[in-house]
């Protein structure tokens, strides 16, 4: 089986030559040279674990390159290696320029890839620190790294990191339960993707008084596909927090049932769906369509029955 670093693009180089090659590559004063379009705003470290497949790694690497076109970044990709047994490291260098509608919209980015032995935490942190752009904020994206391993990085690799990132819809563990040194500096991509959903739900429900939304509420049911398990968990947490005031208006609010259901067959039609059930016959339903960037609200909350479309992606 190939190591992940061999599945990603880039030029093989000795680890010690990467920074020198970078300097030579961008060293030009000409106004039309690539260096004129290279102005990094941040460092982004993409950190893979053992069980990440080549396809998953390529997908996330491509996503990060797309991100770097909008927000120029120095990308560092950490790839665990099964072939390295002596503590040594491997390196690759990837660079590419993207041209927009005009030459002025050109953007150049770089990615430094490192193959390493996972047990070598200290040396890994040292090498990453050498590759980081100084004086720029750093973001660390964990992808498939076990929680126990992440904890080992807390006092070396994660020192000085502005934000640690993970995707709960991908991870096999709930990393929100990890003993992070600064939980406020940790972000879940699944929660970030929910922003337009929360905006759509909030905009619609704000047209009703809180008392009316709370009275006779029997259950809140959230159904999700396997691929959107993180969104399901984060959305029900948000709803539970929003409806926490219900006990002020209805003494039975503490009896409201919050139910999360994994729905395999939902994948093809509605991979994420929400329903409020009321004992008096009222209801509120929202669902995300499997294709496209739209969802739909269907409700009967005391006024006339309503059915409207909602945008669920920016």
List each language-model region with its residue ranges:
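Internal, hydrophobic cores of structured domains that mediate oligomerization or house catalytic pockets
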Residues: 94-101, 105-206
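A contiguous, surface-oriented mixed alpha/beta subdomain in the mid-to-C-terminal portion of proteins
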Residues: 169-172, 176-263
């Amino acid at each position: 089986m190939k190591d992940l670093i061999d599945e990603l693009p880039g030029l093989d180089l000795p680890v010690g030559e990467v920074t020198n090659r970078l300097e030579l590559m961008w060293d030009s004063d000409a106004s039309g040279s690539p260096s004129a379009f290279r102005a990094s705003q941040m460092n982004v470290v993409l950190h893979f674990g053992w069980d990440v497949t080549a396809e998953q790694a390529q997908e996330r690497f491509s996503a990060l390159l797309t991100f770097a076109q909008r927000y120029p970044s120095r990308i560092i990709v950490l790839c665990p290696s099964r072939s390295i047994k002596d503590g040594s490291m491997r390196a690759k260098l990837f660079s590419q320029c993207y041209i927009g509608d005009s030459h002025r919209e050109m953007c150049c980015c770089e990615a430094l890839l490192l193959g390493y032995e996972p047990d070598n935490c200290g040396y890994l942190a040292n090498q990453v620190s050498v590759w980081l752009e100084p004086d720029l904020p750093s973001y660390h994206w964990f992808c498939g790294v076990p929680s126990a391993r992440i904890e080992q990085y807390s006092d070396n690799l994660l020192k000085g990191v502005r934000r640690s990132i993970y995707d709960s819809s991908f991870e096999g563990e709930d990393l929100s339960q990890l003993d992070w040194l600064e939980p406020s500096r940790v972000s879940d991509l699944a929660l970030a993707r929910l922003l337009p959903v929360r905006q759509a739900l909030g905009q619609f429900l704000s047209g009703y008084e809180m008392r009316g939304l709370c009275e006779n509420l029997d259950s809140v049911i959230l159904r999700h596909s396997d691929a959107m398990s993180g969104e399901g968990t984060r959305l029900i947490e948000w709803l539970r927090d929003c409806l926490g005031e219900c006990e002020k208006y209805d003494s039975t609010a503490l009896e409201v049932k919050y139910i999360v259901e994994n729905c395999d067959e939902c994948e093809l039609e509605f991979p994420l769906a929400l329903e409020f059930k009321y004992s008096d016959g009222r209801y509120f339903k929202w669902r995300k369509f499997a294709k496209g960037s739209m969802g739909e609200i269907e409700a009967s909350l005391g006024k006339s029955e309503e059915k409207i479309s909602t945008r669920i992606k920016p």
